[in-house]
Amino acid sequence: MAFRPLYIGDWKEFRVFTLINKQNQTFLNMRDFKDIKVAVAGTGYVGLSIATLLAQHHHVTAVDVIPEKVEKLNNKISPIQDDYIEKYLAEKPLNLVATLNGKSAYADADFVVIAAPTNYDSKKNFFDTSAVEAVIELVLQSNPNAIMVIKSTIPVGYTAYVRKKYNCSNIIFSPEFLRESKALYDNLYPSRIIVGTDMEDERLVKAANSFADLLKEGAIKEDINTLIMGFTEAEAVKLFANTY
């Protein structure tokens, strides 16, 4: 599936919602926060850094289609070059397993983080979102109640599009601002955390807050600037970051 990027004319109209710092975590109607289970689809630098970050405090299952990567992860060896990931896998008591079986991993997850590749073809001017949609389809088959968080790079307008395509409200978006080879470090010391959600849906706003809480819980940095906003605004923030 190819999706052509949309462009927003008036950036001044963006409405950004700041997440107020709270003493208590926000809970979803799922497991207690401490017992939340996460599945991560994709073990490139985005997916693996998120999986490593969250596995400090939660059960995380990393899903990939390459057997060699799964085998390495289950032997606490990083399949990618990242000093912090290598160190954490070797030295930290992470609650992390890897599997080729996405359906099984997603079936028991509260959150499914989608970090599948979305290659951009500059000549044809589109993102190949087929890998993202393959994950969404498998999650809908095995666990339609899971909250899916797209971390892949996507064009402006895509989250609303895919929610409509699959008639699924459980899809939100959280842009990443990571450097390759320093991805876990950038998650431990994030410049900001942004989650795009449906601001009219109280349940999804809670889901966005809870996902932001998961990221903050795993980080070393304190007082992280955290923003909850609409899907399009979050996608545009990522577009701006990539452009400038």
Give a label for each model feature.
Residues 85-110:
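A structured beta-alpha segment of the ubiquitous adenosine-cofactor-binding alpha/beta core
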Residues 30-77:
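NAD(P)+-binding Rossmann beta1-loop-alpha1 motif at the extreme N-terminus of oxidoreductases
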Residues 38-40, 148, 193:
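Conserved hydrophobic helix-helix packing surfaces used for dimerization/oligomerization
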Residues 120-182:
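Rossmann-like NAD(P)(H) cofactor-binding subdomain of soluble oxidoreductases
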Residues 33, 103-107, 188:
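A short, aliphatic-rich alpha-helical micro-motif
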Residues 116-118, 153, 199:
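Short glycine-/small-residue-rich Rossmann-like dinucleotide-binding loops
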